[in-house]
Amino acid sequence: MPLRQYPERVTDDLIRWARAKPDAVFLAERRGETWETITFGAMLQRVRRIGAALLAAGGSHERPLAIVAENGIDHATIVLAAMYAGIPASPISTGYVRPDADPARLQALLGVLQPFAAFVPDAAYADRFAATAPALHLFKDASALAGDNASALADHGASNGDRPATRDPSAADRAHAALGGDSVAKILFTSGSTGTPKGVMITHRMLCANQTMLEQVWPDAIRDPVLVDWAPWSHVAAGNKNFGLVLRNGGTMFVDAGKPAPGAFDTTLRNLREIAPTFYFNVPRGWALLFEALESDDALATTFFSRLRILLNAGASIPESLRARLNALAQRYAGHDVPVVSAWGLTETAPMATAVWGERPAERETIGTPVPGVEIKLAPVEDRYELRVRGPSVTPGYWRNAEATAAAFDEDGFFKTGDAGALLDESDPSRGIVFGGRLAENFKLSSGTWVNAGLLRLDVIEAGEGTIEDVVFAGADRDELTAIVFVPRALANDPAIRERVRAALARHNECNPASSTRVARALIAAEPPNGAHGEITDKGSVNQRRVLQNRAADVARLYAEPRGSAIIVP
């Protein structure tokens, strides 16, 4: 299917809906017991005024704006205003300014970005940011930038002469008219934690093309969308795909301040009891928590399924045990199946490059097939295949990093993703691509045999039948494969949990006896993955490399002789 024509600028969608339905609610953010909202018409007016203020303060296509903020109306307004005025917006993970964050990481990122200013509305975040970058101007108040208050700049590094003097939107309108598809709309930093951060240039063409791809693959599911979404806008899936889905289709996003983590998920459940989504996005950890709540709360489940059209899982397919639970819930509360689809992509592909879609969709255990306009190459890398991508939704490269840009593309212009994959059926590509995890996360045993950590994780969780919430594998250059197992909170104190984990791994090993799939030893982690220590990514998945680093003592115990009493042998 060819890709249809798409708008030239992502902000054209805001203009379209501001004219077509100016009073329709675009975004909603909880304030205590009520929801604060902003309409498409009001958003456009604020965006134009703030865009002019940002230009007057020194922003340009070469001087981006850093944004360190939780999701919300002000965050969205600032991002749209910068993009409207031709200033690249760079949402940065709030993890960079949390109390235990290493300031050197933020310094390195800002050294690459070279912003003219930063928007940091939270006082504690602003103090930590200012301590790291004392010379950088900090905007703290979106209303002030729009001309609603007396001042717009924080005291950190700002003089009275730095304060934007104009709220006339004409300068922003002129800048917007000069934008084209190649103009950089955003700069998103890759989540890798080693080396110098890389800022991915996201152009207006990438964003617009990717939303048209979404429209073509799931046309009925995304019409008039209502989203209740927690995923951080510093991450490509939420900031580009989910936010863009609402903007393109004139829908409404309810910003969820919760997330799939202990102590924070109750906020998500509260929001879902009030607001019924039509499109819902989550990660495997989030699905497990959500299904547990849906199965025990009739009111929640009734609301959740009342107008739900599609569920999108980030990354590869969810375990069959979770899928079966979902199907049972959907039949009970909706009276029909609700599609659970997978898609794949990364920051450099805007993000969506493949999806389960079409009249004859790919098999559900795959990441689907290329979306319209996208080409996928399976390139041999040693004894595996790397997924490489070409199309209008692929980045032109990395911000201020010509060397990394040149290394990112092959001789045919395909972007080298670093992800492994293979056709489910080489004789029938339409059956889809099986995701093989990150090439860098896979490893070799001492025998030279590769361990595909991504696929193995799904198999072990499936064998756990609810006993194993997540798992991280060790064994690089070792004789045997071992595992650190994370169990659900509800089972952590179950006296039978060790035996349940042992039995689950034994079931897995019986079906997967090869050295690259058989788990020889395991231990149950004493603590769940710690986001503050980098063990959980912004999108809620477990960071395998960081877990192994932080829990090196556990890895040593797995291979120690004589074997300790905490070690489980399936």
Describe every region a protein language model picked out:
Residues 469-474, 509-570:
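Conserved C-terminal "lid"/linker of ANL adenylate-forming enzymes
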Residues 22-25, 157, 162, 166-189, ...:
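Conserved pre-ATP/AMP-binding loop-to-beta segment of ANL
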Residues 208-226, 233-302:
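Conserved AMP-binding/adenylation subdomain of ANL enzymes
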Residues 36-37, 51-96, 229-230:
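Conserved AMP-binding/adenylate-forming
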Residues 37-41, 177, 185-212, 357:
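Conserved AMP-binding A3 loop
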Residues 380, 385-445, 567-568:
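Conserved ATP-binding/catalytic segment of the ANL
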Residues 249, 278-281, 291-363, 375, ...:
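Gly/Ser/Thr-rich phosphate-binding loop
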